[in-house]
Curated annotation (Swiss-Prot):
Residues 430-442, 453-462, 477-486, 505-515, 557-571 have a biased composition (Basic and acidic residues). Gene3D superfamilies: 1.10.287.4070, Nop domain. Keywords: Nucleus, Ribonucleoprotein, Ribosome biogenesis, rRNA processing. It comes from Neosartorya fischeri (strain ATCC 1020 / DSM 3700 / CBS 544.65 / FGSC A1164 / JCM 1740 / NRRL 181 / WB 181) (Aspergillus fischerianus). GO terms for biological process: box C/D sno(s)RNA 3'-end processing; endonucleolytic cleavage in 5'-ETS of tricistronic rRNA transcript (SSU-rRNA, 5.8S rRNA, LSU-rRNA); endonucleolytic cleavage in ITS1 to separate SSU-rRNA from 5.8S rRNA and LSU-rRNA from tricistronic rRNA transcript (SSU-rRNA, 5.8S rRNA, LSU-rRNA); endonucleolytic cleavage to generate mature 5'-end of SSU-rRNA from (SSU-rRNA, 5.8S rRNA, LSU-rRNA); protein localization to nucleolus; snoRNA guided rRNA 2'-O-methylation. Residues 285-410 form the Nop domain. This is Nucleolar protein 58. Residues 581-591 have a biased composition (Basic residues). GO terms for cellular component: box C/D methylation guide snoRNP complex; nucleolus; small-subunit processome. PROSITE patterns: NOP. Required for pre-18S rRNA processing. May bind microtubules.
Amino acid sequence: MTLFILTETSAGYALLKAKDKKLLKRDDLATEASTAEGVSNLVKLKSFQKFDSAATALEEVASLVEGKVTPRLASLLDEIKDEKKVSLAVADPKLGNAIGKLPGMSIQLVADSTTTDIFRAIREHLPTLIPGLLPQDMSTMSLGLSHSLARHKLKFSPDKIDTMIVQAIGLLDDLDKELNTYAMRVKEWYGWHFPELAKILNDNIAYAKLVLKMGMRSNWETADLAEILPEELEGTVKAAADRSMGTEISQEDLENIQALAEQVVGFAEYRQQLAGYLTARMNAIAPNLTALVGELVGARLIAHAGSLTNLSKSPASTIQILGAEKALFRALKTKHDTPKYGLIYHASLIGQATGKNKGKMARVLAAKASLGLRVDALAEWDDDATEEDKAALGTEARYNLERKLAAMEGKPLKPRGVAIGPNGASVQPKKFEINETRRYNADADALTGDQPASKKDKKLIEEVSDEEMADADSDEEPKANGTKDDDSSDESEEESSKKHKSKKGKDTELEKMAEKAGLSVKRYKRKLERGEITFDANGNPSATSKKELKKAKKEAKKASKGDEKKRKRSDDGEEADNGEKKKKKKKKGEE
């Protein structure tokens, strides 16, 4: 069986033919192939397919790495396609499987450890096997192709560098810790000299700037603090400095305190700059995620997942509890309820929800964030696309979530036509102007209280004339003729109006009670029929869940069982006492 060897080089594809059919089974293959002459005696060049350019070489090698057969390689293999009893040695088993799947290719493929020695020898002495190929050119082409292949694998893009976000959010958290530590140290240190200042100023940055500006508290008269503090606080600080109870410090102590205060101010300025940089990078890399959860929460999610691509591959359920892994595994181990949210808890939408709705909002927000992440990671935008176009999905989803949250909380909904800004917040409306209302015209009133009402003198005794009682038939005749008495019609109208008013009153009462219970009118009626509404001492309703009702029923059953046991015990005790009394009576009778 004829043996062919396929070699992939940076210059092109080389197809070599072995002079010995049993070349791979020889024991002295490594020793004979150690020199260029030995390799040339073992194999000879059958065909060579050269790459036209560096770009072509990159495409071909990238396809080979993925285990794909390119048209150029397939055309080279067509030369040995018609030969019978042929075996082909390939260095990569994945490539060998792909070649074996080619239509009409009946070749025995060899891609195991027996080919390592011959491939090593061919790579070392390749210029001697291919005429016109110099060793210097070979090394240059290999170096250039390796650089291009590495760049191709990295898929370098300055707009998709999520490593910068990971480092920036980590540095931001470290700065917050250090800034807090240094600021507290400044307060404790300078507090020996001016202890009243810490109670007046709560802002750490303003405190450090004031220490740098004023120095000794005795300089309060000449120090201009208008740039740091408002007028009211400035007067309070100066008055406190005038009658301070602090100790005196030396100039050397003040210099060290001011050096630390300079560090605090410098860290604060750099933190503000870093926060702006992080916001810009998040809007460029993940605009939809930023519109939904904010730049800080989005950056922490990306940092926790490792990269934007890894986070986009995660399902919504994973994004929802990302950051709460310890609580999740603890709950699974102890068979308790799993956590509802992780890092996503700090998003503004979840912060706006009440306790009972936080879990629902976390689930819905994680689902929308997973969709936005896939768009951010995998979408390819044109150069003409604006930031609003890129963040359109996240902005629209945030607006829908805000409406859903308002519906759950019972708050008024925003109108559908409201304008939404790039940050997801609604644009403020124009200034509301109050028009002058129409005044009440008092001249149009008619005064009727000047004339007293006429009173008719009623007789103490009146004569009533006797009237004959009409028959039942005569009473029914006018009714049958389609006429009714005026009195009966008035009474029926009054009754219908009373019923209508009572229905309205009941509906308004139901609406009020439903609002107090935090439910809709339908749910309030349903729960009231089921007995799931309880009233406190003031008459305010509150809804109870099915779990609470079950617990209450179980407790009532336990209490009833306990009472029955106590009754049985008391009955047994009474029977025992009665038996003892009877025995005593019998003994007395016998005596």
